[in-house]
């Protein structure tokens, strides 16, 4: 693919079981080493919105040691950040700073901790560690259950913005605004967690 097309960024999401990771990601990682100039956006999908684990502990360890290092941006939610860094809680500013330090030691260049699962009922606050600074990016929290796929959509929007030439901070702010509108104008379809409106 890279011999025929020009890639401006690479996005990685749910990678499945450890066997799947070993079989497929070794091939991907080997290819990526030839294109280190291309930023990798890594969304470590480990826990579903309902709280179910999507990766087993051995798969998570393999993921952290072999996939996370070298990525340009990692976008965990609060639960995933807690699992990866082995922190019991991430609530205070001090917790956020400690969490970012742990991610740095694991090999992550930049990290966006998504606060959609926080206890704040009025705002959804994300924290971005970029160029050795911590930025707070907040958005209004809407009273809706139509939030299925918010994390995946956010990382995809950031990836698209980076491909368009935005720096990481602007790309993240723009993506956050897009997510807010997609949730605000979401669809009421079926039961449970409904879909966003990606065409907002």
Which functions belong to the PLM regions below?
Residues 4-21:
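Short, small-residue-biased leader/transition segments that mark boundaries at the very start
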Residues 17, 41-48, 75-84, 137:
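Short beta-strands and strand-loop turn motifs
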Residues 17-18, 22-66:
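Glycine/small-residue-rich loop that forms an oxyanion/phosphate-binding "nest" at active or ligand-binding sites
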Residues 56-134:
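Conserved phosphate/ATP/ADP-binding segment of small-molecule kinases
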Residues 83, 144-168:
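Short, small-residue alpha-helix embedded
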Residues 134-148:
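Short pre-catalytic strand/loop immediately N-terminal to key active-site residues, enriched for Gly-Thr
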Residues 134-135, 161-175:
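Phosphate-handling active-site elements
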Residues 169-200:
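Charged C-terminal helix
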């Amino acid at each position: 693919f890279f011999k025929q097309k020009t890639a401006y960024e690479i996005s990685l999401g749910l990678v499945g079981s450890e066997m799947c990771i070993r079989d497929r990601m070794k091939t991907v990682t080997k290819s990526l080493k030839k294109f280190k100039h291309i930023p990798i956006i890594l969304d470590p999908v480990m826990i579903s919105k309902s709280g179910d684990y999507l990766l087993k502990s051995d798969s998570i360890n393999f993921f952290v040691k072999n996939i996370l290092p070298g990525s340009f941006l990692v976008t965990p939610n609060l639960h995933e950040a807690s699992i990866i860094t082995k922190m019991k809680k991430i609530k205070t500013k001090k917790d956020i700073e400690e969490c970012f330090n742990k991610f740095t030691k694991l090999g992550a260049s930049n990290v966006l901790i998504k606060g959609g699962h926080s206890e704040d009922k009025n705002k959804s606050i994300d924290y971005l560690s970029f160029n050795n600074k911590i930025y707070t990016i907040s958005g209004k929290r809407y009273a809706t259950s139509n939030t299925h796929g918010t994390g995946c959509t956010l990382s995809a929007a950031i990836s698209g913005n980076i491909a368009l030439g935005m720096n990481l901070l602007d790309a993240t702010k723009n993506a956050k605004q897009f997510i807010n509108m997609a949730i605000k104008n979401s669809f009421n379809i079926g039961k449970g967690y409904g879909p966003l409106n990606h065409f907002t």
